[in-house]
A protein has these predicted regions:
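The substrate-binding groove and active-site-proximal loops of carbohydrate-active enzymes
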Residues: 32-42, 68-83, 130-149, 234-250, ...
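Polysaccharide-binding and catalytic clefts of secreted carbohydrate-active enzymes
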Residues: 125-313, 317
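Short, well-ordered coil/turn segments that N-cap beta-strands
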Residues: 28-32, 59-61, 93-99, 161-166, ...
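Carbohydrate-binding surfaces of carbohydrate-active enzymes
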Residues: 226, 295-698
Length: 698
């Protein structure tokens, strides 16, 4: 039973639970293309005629079509006009270009908001908002859900057998942007209260106790008193975020059901931004393949390296939402994104390098926003393969065509996996809890803590999955828990289970502060299970000024000083590996270990400098038996492995303008040229080397 059915009495049609094989192994080629918006050019038939020919020249094999086209598909209520879409689909098919056909519900036409005001959202002050922007609708509106279901079903019924149809692009960037996702109309508030009644077994006393509502006399005596617009009520706000997430996921389910009533083709929707608009793992369970939009700003500055690291870890995060399903980079910019502070052009070769970096981390396709830029609207200056109605013989067009040649040579990579022995845990419920929490404002959010812990593995080419606390950890040899502020039920048990079988689990001080309702854990931080597993008791924690350093005992385990935070813990069965050496912290444990079954729990009680994390994780990799596919001393190379049943593929990307050497050993072949490669090889400036080698015994 869906969220809608349970809490707001909206009927949801039954979905036919049939899907085709994933589009990557079925077609056995990398998807390459982009968002295509012919509805913006219906007044220019010459452009509509020329686009498929230009796409063919650029090596485009797939487009996302019709994403914001509702007004062109249904200019007036019930007046469906698909003739133009028929023509576009037919033209694309003649050039053997596949289509991810979009459902248009991310932006409703103006006539709908005018005729049915209930589809428009209400702000926290109770004011109905006018038509504007996109994602500007109420997800509990029966009218809006009916209209979305109707247009989706019309599309699916009409195009289910069209030979160009590869799959369905459901909606676009669910969650929109901050402020877009939440509606405070009475229907949404009633739905929230019903959602809470189910969560707390219709027991208001239990809710009051769980939320600690005696603070500031917030005790509720009737469910109708609960409102989510008071930021001081942290537990209420956290559950409002969860409710909103469930609404978004349920809305996606509603859209998918309408499509799959008629079409069994695979579905996706594009994730984006900072991944905390909703629970992406829940959304991923609805999708046949995942997709993501990435717009890193590469500007030729020292910050570029951090942005390239972001490309890697966000790709690992997307893959972690559904580890056994394929994913594709559904939006990227081939040139100059308009929404960055500095409108910097990509230097020659950067687009290729960035695109193949996503492929190295599991993407089975590279697509763009946008194929052709529109002449008007908010994104008219955003980069595209073809800019407006200008000639296509440009540097950007040529680079896109060149990348297409590379992707064609990488067909054997399609459907291959990214082996990882290390997991870093990031949980959206902790992110929401951090946003709702008052205090600790000097500390980075759980998401902002990821780069420091990801970096040591990234520089060594060690595969990492970024997963949430509900994941299956059984395949990992090393699990890092940097800042799971909120402990969800069962997480401690899963960590103890994998440690028993040989995994090394590393906890850090911003983990395990609050329970599922944002109240401090019983008995203090970490909770009773993890305190016992770690063999420590955290007594108090100090947060340091940016200029402060606390000396650490010289050891093999870390380099440098303690920074940012110093946790003062006492041991209760743990072995002390390092102690603090200065101030009143001197003598307290800074790093502890407790053997647990065949593995161990480690507790790093302080923040570390980059060199400190680098040394700590290098030692833990040695102990856990974790290594990358190639050994290199360079910190300017990205190395990532993918594996099919028969072949290993190792990607080596040089992030600098200086050639880099790497030792690869014997038996490799270039996946791009077929040339045999062995021993030491030079990777050119801003270049990419892709190695392939048969797996022994295959």
């Amino acid at each position: 039973m869906s969220v809608a059915e349970r809490f707001i009495s909206i009927p949801v049609e039954v979905c036919i639970p049939v899907t085709l094989p994933n589009p990557f192994t079925a077609t056995r080629h990398m998807l390459h293309g982009g968002d295509y918006n012919p509805d913006q050019w219906l007044h220019r038939p010459d452009i509509l005629e020329s686009d498929p020919e230009l796409m063919d020249r650029a090596g485009v094999n797939t487009v996302s079509l019709g994403i914001f086209s509702w007004a062109a598909m249904e200019p007036n209520e019930g007046d469906f006009r698909f003739d133009w879409l028929d023509d576009v689909m037919d033209r694309l098919h003649k050039k053997e270009i596949s289509v991810l056909l979009a459902t248009p519900g991310a932006a409703r036409p103006h006539w709908m908001g005018q005729k049915y005001p209930e589809v428009l959202p209400v702000n926290a002050e109770g004011v109905r908002q006018p038509c504007r922007g996109r994602h500007w609708f109420c997800r509990t509106s029966q009218v809006y859900r009916d209209k979305v279901h109707t247009i989706n079903a019309e599309l699916a019924q009409r195009y289910q057998s069209h030979p160009a149809l590869l799959g369905w692009h459901i909606n676009n960037e669910y969650g929109g942007a901050p402020g877009y996702a939440h509606c405070y109309c009475e229907r949404c508030l009633a739905g929230f209260r019903s959602w809470l009644r189910r969560r707390y077994d219709d027991d208001l006393d239990r809710l009051n106790q769980s939320w600690w509502t005696t603070f500031w006399a917030h005790t509720y005596t009737d469910w109708s008193q609960i409102r989510p617009d008071d930021p001081t009520n942290e537990s209420c706000l956290l559950n409002w975020y969860r409710y909103q997430s469930d609404l978004i996921v349920d809305f996606a389910r509603h859209e998918i059901d309408a499509v799959k009533t008629f079409s069994a083709h695979p579905v996706t929707t594009n994730f984006h931004g900072h991944m905390s608009f909703f629970d992406h793992r829940e959304m991923a369970s609805l999708l046949d393949f995942l997709s993501f939009d990435a717009y890193p700003q590469i500007e030729g500055s020292a910050a570029d390296r951090d942005r390239r690291r972001w490309v890697s870890y966000v790709s690992d995060m997307v893959r972690g939402f559904a580890p056994h399903r394929p994913w594709v980079l559904l939006e990227s910019c081939p040139s100059q994104p308009q929404h960055k502070p500095l409108a910097r052009l990509k230097r020659p070769g950067v687009h290729r390098s960035l695109s193949l970096q996503h492929v190295a981390h599991g993407a089975d396709g590279v697509m763009y926003f946008q194929w052709r830029a529109g002449r008007g609207g908010k994104e008219k200056l955003h980069g595209a393969v073809v800019m407006h109605d200008t000639p296509a013989d440009t540097r950007v067009f040529r680079e896109v065509a060149s990348l297409s040649s590379d992707l064609n040579r990488l067909k054997p990579v399609c459907g291959s996996s990214c082996p990882s022995s290390v997991a870093i845990v990031w949980d959206v419920h902790s992110e929401w809890a951090w946003q709702c929490n008052h205090g600790l404002t000097s500390e980075p959010s759980p998401r902002a803590q990821l780069p420091a812990h990801y970096e040591p593995f990234w520089t060594r080419g060690i595969g990492v999955d970024i997963v949430d606390s509900t994941a299956d950890f059984s395949a990992y040899q090393l699990v890092i828990v940097p800042g799971v502020f909120l402990l969800r039920p069962g997480f401690a048990d899963r960590l103890m289970a994998i440690a028993t079988t040989g995994c090394h689990v590393v906890l850090h001080p911003l983990t395990g502060w609050v329970d599922d309702d944002l109240c401090v854990l019983p008995g203090g931080r970490l909770g009773p299970e993890l305190r016992e597993a770690c063999g420590i008791y955290p007594e108090e924690i100090d947060f340091l000024r940016p200029d402060e350093r606390v000396l650490l005992e010289p050891s093999e385990w870390v380099r440098g000083d303690a920074v940012k935070r110093c946790d003062l813990v006492r041991t209760d069965g743990a072995e002390v590996m390092i102690t603090y050496q200065s101030d009143f912290y001197a003598g307290y444990p800074a790093l502890t270990r407790k053997e647990y079954g065949q593995g161990a729990f480690w507790y790093c009680a302080c923040g570390l400098e980059a060199q400190g994390y680098d040394r700590l994780y290098a030692r833990l990799c040695e102990i856990a038996g974790v290594s990358g596919p190639l050994k290199t001393e360079s910190t300017s190379l990205v190395i990532r492995e993918r594996r099919s049943e028969e072949t290993r593929f190792v990607f080596v990307l040089n992030l600098t303008q200086t050639p880099n050497r790497v030792s690869v050993g014997a038996g490799w072949v270039s996946a791009l040229t077929g040339e045999s490669i062995s021993d030491e090889v030079v990777v050119g400036a801003n270049d990419v080397l892709i190695l392939s080698q048969p797996i022994e015994g295959r």
